[in-house]
Amino acid sequence: MSMPMDVSKKSFKPAKTQKSKTISNDYIKGLQTKHFLLYNVIPTIGTITAIALLWWYPISSVEIGLLIGMWALSMIGMSVGLHRYFAHRAFKTSQTMSVILAILGCMGAQGPVVSWVAVHRRHHEYSDLPGDPHSPNPELLGEGIFGTLRGLWHAHVGWLTNHEYPNPMYYAPELMRDKTISKINRNYVVWIVLGLLIPTILGGIIHGSWIGAVEGLLWGGFVRMFVVDNSILSINSFSHAFGTHPFDSKDQSRNNIWVAIPTFGESWQNNHHTFENSAAIGLKWWQIDLGYCLIWGLEKLGLVWDVKLPTAKMIEAKKLA
């Protein structure tokens, strides 16, 4: 059943014995650069290649289906899994469902479960202040149009190779102790490869050719990764710079309708930063929130429970005059 959420409660309990909130050394910086090249640059090249090949190999319903299907699976993993479940504990579920959500989240290739959660929890702790890994706040990077552009660039992509790594022992201690999640974490690359193999194999089987397999890899693999990646990154940049700010969230988060569908409803950032533990990010009937639609359906099926939602009184109390 759904339950009122405690808006004052943090999403996690920091480890009392762990003093350092961040880790910064040459090894970590090297990993950040490698991750960026492998899972941001290569999908971008793959997307350009897929578009260039349209002249010789027009896209078919198969490629469109693989793109949409793999995008949906990745976004379920990232929006419902990594974000609302693992980072904010907006609902409870079984170990089997948590494993499925974790693997699907890893297919999005934005970091292992523990790393993703640690970065996100630090973002909420320092939202749009010094210490936020990916704020576009121009006050942190300079005023004027150039400061704004630098802020947007930093929040969207610049931070990926240049941020202090949040210490998982501080920000995600319960996940570090979870043996199942730790095993999924260690096999992060396996899940990314699986996310590439599925559309490759399906494309080859459906088309009955190697060309079909390559098309499946390009559209269901690399283009899908590019779309998912930039959709999520747009939340960091555009949804903390443009849009409405109806609630007193103590930061610069904005509600942005333009990327609501591709982000599964994650773009209602002012709502989210005001009620961070809520399973629903879209709080009005017209605020599209595919992630919560799925959670609602899973709750009806008994697959998730204790779904946290703000009451009407809580929402009214946080509205700006």
Curated annotation (Swiss-Prot):
InterPro entries: Acyl-CoA_DS, FA_desaturase_dom. CDD domains: Delta9-FADS-like. It catalyses: 5-hexenoyl-[ACP] + 2 reduced [2Fe-2S]-[ferredoxin] + O2 + 2 H(+) = 5-hexynoyl-[ACP] + 2 oxidized [2Fe-2S]-[ferredoxin] + 2 H2O; hexanoyl-[ACP] + 2 reduced [2Fe-2S]-[ferredoxin] + O2 + 2 H(+) = 5-hexenoyl-[ACP] + 2 oxidized [2Fe-2S]-[ferredoxin] + 2 H2O. A motif (Histidine box-1) lies at residues 83-88. It is a multi-pass membrane protein. A motif (Histidine box-2) lies at residues 120-124. Induction: Part of the jamaicamide (jam) biosynthetic gene cluster, encoding enzymes catalyzing most or all of jamaicamide biosynthesis. Its main location: membrane. Keywords: Fatty acid metabolism, Iron, Lipid metabolism, Membrane, Oxidoreductase, Transmembrane, Transmembrane helix. GO terms for biological process: fatty acid metabolic process. The keyword Electron transport does not apply. Its EC number is 1.14.19.40. The keyword Nucleotide-binding does not apply. GO terms for molecular function: oxidoreductase activity, acting on paired donors, with oxidation of a pair of donors resulting in the reduction of molecular oxygen to two molecules of water. A motif (Histidine box-3) lies at residues 269-273. Belongs to the fatty acid desaturase type 2 family. Desaturase involved in the biosynthesis of jamaicamides, which show sodium channel blocking activity and fish toxicity. Catalyzes the conversion of 5-hexenoyl loaded onto the acyl carrier protein JamC (5-hexenoyl-JamC) to 5-hexynoyl-JamC. Can also catalyze the conversion of hexanoyl-JamC to 5-hexenoyl-JamC, but it cannot use free 5-hexenoic acid, 5-hexenoyl-CoA, 2-hexenoyl-JamC, 3-hexenoyl-JamC or 4-hexenoyl-JamC. Is specific for C(6) chains, and cannot use 4-pentenoyl-JamC, 6-heptenoyl-JamC or 7-octenoyl-JamC as substrate. The histidine box domains are involved in binding the catalytic metal ions. This is Hex-5-enoyl-[acyl-carrier protein] acetylenase.
